[in-house]
Amino acid sequence: MNSNLPAENLTIAVNMTKTLPTAVTHGFNSTNDPPSMSITRLFPALLECFGIVLCGYIAGRANVITSTQAKGLGNFVSRFALPALLFKNMVVLNFSNVDWSFLYSILIAKASVFFIVCVLTLLVASPDSRFSKAGLFPIFATQSNDFALGYPIVEALYQTTYPEYLQYIYLVAPISLMMLNPIGFIFCEIQKWKDTQNASQNKIKIVGLGLLRVLQNPIVFMVFIGIAFNFILDRKVPVYVENFLDGLGNSFSGSALFYLGLTMVGKIKRLKKSAFVVLILLITAKLLVLPLLCREMVELLDKGDSVVNHTSLSNYAFLYGVFPVAPGVAIFATQFNMEVEIITSGMVISTFVSAPIMYVSAWLLTFPTMDPKPLAYAIQNVSFDISIVSLISLIWSLAILLLSKKYKQLPHMLTTNLLIAQSIVCAGMMIWNFVKEKNFVGQILVFVLLYSSLYSTYLWTGLLAISLFLLKKRERVQIPVGIIIISGWGIPALLVGVLLITGKHNGDSIDSAFFYGKEQMITTAVTLFCSILIAGISLMCMNQTAQAGSYEGFDQSQSHKVVEPGNTAFEESPAPVNEPELFTSSIPETSCCSCSMGNGELHCPSIEPIANTSTSEPVIPSFEKNNHCVSRCNSQSCILAQEEEQYLQSGDQQLTRHVLLCLLLIIGLFANLSSCLWWLFNQEPGRLYVELQFFCAVFNFGQGFISFGIFGLDKHLIILPFKRRLEFLWNNKDTAENRDSPVSEEIKMTCQQFIHYHRDLCIRNIVKERRCGAKTSAGTFCGCDLVSWLIEVGLASDRGEAVIYGDRLVQGGVIQHITNEYEFRDEYLFYRFLQKSPEQSPPAINANTLQQERYKEIEHSSPPSHSPKT
């Protein structure tokens, strides 16, 4: 597309200008043409959609709704709410107003992306999983979240200008489901046939299974039924049926977005080395290649009479292509049990990456011309607004790192520096907005602050990636933390200083990105290239270590490795077991943990060594001998308590979160580098370049959103305490009724069942003797071990429900944390069973007394033996 926009008036990151008068700022159109969309409603729509998604994610992370419970909501959304919504809209759809050229343009664009991804996957994928990838990856790249996320945004943009565009959502969505997805399903069925070597399954049966999966989809089924009733009922739904359908359909949007947030919990984990490149390529195909192809196909094939409508349709096609991946793709991957990690992780990443792209795209599509002044002021306003919100997010994220004391450990120490640099960038942008154009000294000072911190954010991406690589090899390589920190702040300051000394100030430009002209552009490009190169090489080299096959995930239930395994209680057993056995087998057993409190002083009862047992048989602690261990351990003297503290401070390195942070930042660095090179080698960049400018502005001053999403919602510091506070306030309403009952009936029944039917088996399976003093040991177990055991025996269907079950055992006095400082967690924290006969024990002086009384009440109120229930 030709453009009259002078290159010197464009920016690499943002146009820094004085505040524009209101009449101009709010009227970007340079002509009197009516706007093609209502941009003022876009931001509230995005906040509404992603706010509900965030609520669902928080509910899942706080275990308010477990993954098993979420399946019920998902079934309601997919089998009741969405089919009802589809049926009604297909019945009332006016097919005479449909632009069919638009539909087959979208079909051609989707089919092109589908077959490109499919062919490339077949060519480069490994033979053992070639067909599963060739089936699911093209579906990932073409199936959009049309109804839950797409429809509210299209409604906000086009409800007042082109309301007929809303009906295209219901017509475009079945294209993927009915025409493209069957091909992917057939490839997946071929992969299943190859894996099982079932010779009886012929080709016709494979194709039939693929088509059957399509027909079983409620969306496809209701589309056909709706079209049939469109002609039968003459596009009029009976009143009583309409009210019923409206009741179901109106519940779709909120529940679908909430369910989308629930499905994101714990999806990004154990990313393998091949997943990084695959994720970037798939997300690029979905969010960049597909929108461009959709737009170009509509431009090429749509032969509408109205030029305005033609342009609006092509813009709408581009916006449609930016919609993120549908959650249904993750469901397909789970059903086939193929490529689940890549598909689910990609769904989460694409959903959040699509938000700024949709915002930028919709904003740019409101400009009928390429007049540089409105574009400059638009970027200015967007950058200023984003900086304010981003700075608040960064302050919150920094507070989380400081309060959790993670800033003292690697790699969070370096992440803290990155967040500080991002905060200075936002503050610098806000200050620049108020600097007078003729105030040269003020401009120089703010320029130094802004660009030294902006270059620092670029470099910290590469430095953080190389620190992650060194962290994987820290047993052989000493991490030069001081050098990394000095480089992260010193090199950007040096570059800006060189620009100030040697560069020629461009007096005609009020834009900070062109303050020193071409020299500044080259400096920015070199900085970006070096950071991308360092980050890319470091992330690839991380896979050369022995444990590079997987990284620690978001889910705290995954196995953790402590920094120095040779000096900790968390030593891994050489046997190939799921969890490390910690100080098991022949250790002298004592009648009590050595760090028990007696009259305020530490004491150790007499040691009664036990006979050596075979290494093949675990030592089962004698709880009858441990009757006197009723006081909590002292964290200053107990080895187990000390190791817990070490684990909490340094064991959770959150490597996957940091790798994800680096990947998202690299995408933004690529965009900035492309913008630099595009400007340097093309004097008439065009509209696409301006969109890239907007994206760069959103990225540079909106990095705080990425950091907040990854580090701002700490589970144990924010979510769980907030959840417990709400539960406390809620339960206070019933205090008068429950004053005479130490524990609720639900907790009491859970504890009764566990004591009579499962306690002894659980002790034999997971409780081990672990050293807690110089010559003493205690029978304990890890919280994550109990969670896995509860799932194994059928007392819980997932880890979320198992945590709830374990928390009830703690409240009922059945188990207890060794120091009584933590609630039940799915982590490597040590817990112990309280003795069966608390009345035989001496009274405790501390908070354990209440738990012992609760346990005694449960034990004495337990019914006689019943048939076990699992």
UniProtKB/Swiss-Prot annotation:
The keyword Transmembrane helix applies. It is a multi-pass membrane protein. GO terms for molecular function: cholesterol binding. Glycans are attached at N9, N15, N29, N309, N381. It is found in: Lysosome membrane. Changing C604A: In 4CA, abolished ability to regulate mTORC1. Homodimer; via the transporter region and DEP domain. Interacts with the GATOR1 complex and prevents interaction between GATOR1 and KICSTOR; this interaction is disrupted upon cholesterol starvation. This is Lysosomal cholesterol signaling protein. It comes from Homo sapiens.
